[in-house]
Amino acid sequence: MDISLDQLWDEALCHLQVQLSRPTFEAWIKTARAESLVDNRLTICTPSEWARGWLQKHYASTITEVVQRVAGIPLQVEFSVSPHASVEAEPPSRAISPTSGRAGSLPASTTLGLEVGGSLPMRAPDLNPKYSFSRFVVGPNNRMAHAAALAVADKPGRAYNPLFLCGGVGLGKTHLMQAIGHYQLEANPQAKVFYVSTERFTNDLIDAIRRDSMQSFREHYRDVDILLVDDVQFIEGKEYTQEEFFHTFNTLHESGKQIVLAADRSPHLIPRLQERLCSRFSMGLIAEIQSPDIETRMAILKKKAEYEGMNLPADVIEYIATTYTSNIRELEGALIRAVAYVSISGLPMSVETIQPILNPPSEPKEITADMITDVVCEEFGIDRDSLLGSSRKRDISQARQIAMFLMRHYTNLSLPKIGDYFGGKDHTTVLYSCEKVSQLQRQSLQFERQLQKLVERLRVVANSRSS
């Protein structure tokens, strides 16, 4: 079935409404309409010459980027004038119809995968069972953040509201945030705890606009006792997302519900963050987590080894802790690599054994999408066409999800660009795949080690091709 011009423009409007401020969208975008699509040339009608000139000058690149992302093919956007455009313009219809009343359609291969009607899926905490207070190692770098998180978990809505955790990648912000959720659910199993990233919030907002279900979206996010929001820095520049989050924040805060936020920097350092949001993020407690010192790193490795049933000599722990100093994720990754290597090689666990594979981290070589494709295909024994195609066979589907996950985390490709690489898949499909792999990573140590093995092979390939 062909995708109609109406459907393309409606979907684009949903994305533009999230990206732009409400006044901008209402004044300039909502009054325009897609007139025709001929030879990959999309014509957009505006109600006046002034509006046409303004869109062309200020928003042409944004509109072009969005419609190409939605269509999955290169499009050229042109603006024309129609005095009836503002009269006929309507908000996105959301309903999906097989035919269009206007000229032009997209090939069936660019199907958008939209759902008709419905509401957001039932909320679930989605907390990693490993992220508890009992498994969190306290040190000088995180003592204040840990104490604040405990206070919030014990008395949500009364201690520090909001609690804003900030610090670099892999320092334990997500661990502490989810530990609050676990603590509260153990104390009160009926508590409504919701953990979400700002990226997920934005995508849910786009879906709500698309389905005309904003009321359901608001109930979904505002009917909670504790809202845990990760990666807040990604809200920067998203005007409508910030506006919706502002009202969600106010509703929860005024109701005495607990809000916990995490970002890689403090609120006032997040660029293009609305001043009113920055003010609210700062009205509770901002707790910074810094890189762990040598004693804390050694304690983290000991606890990790203890929980995973690993027997590590003291000098091995000291060597890893001395070699990897920047963050906990890197530290634990080194431990997993060392254990995997010893298990595969049959050699004894010693500094001499693991030293060759745990050299001090150097400047990483660029990993490309093609490298990831080659390594994943080799690992799973499948061909490139199958991986990049649409086969739903379980082994191919999982390999594809892993490849998408690796591209998201080890390349600079955006979600839409990754979708394009896999034959024009929607960015929500890519996001789902990444979340699925993250979930498997949390649930299975064996899967986590397999993933780490793939990453190591990627680094070897990247280094060999750059030398």
Swiss-Prot record:
Residues 96-108 have a biased composition (Polar residues). GO terms for cellular component: cytoplasm; plasma membrane. The gene is dnaA. GO terms for molecular function: ATP binding; ATP hydrolysis activity; DNA replication origin binding; lipid binding. Residues 343-467 are annotated as: Domain IV, binds dsDNA. It comes from Synechococcus sp. (strain JA-2-3B'a(2-13)) (Cyanobacteria bacterium Yellowstone B-Prime). Its main location: cytoplasm. Pfam families: Bac_DnaA, Bac_DnaA_C, DnaA_N. This is Chromosomal replication initiator protein DnaA. Belongs to the DnaA family. It is found in: Cytoplasm.
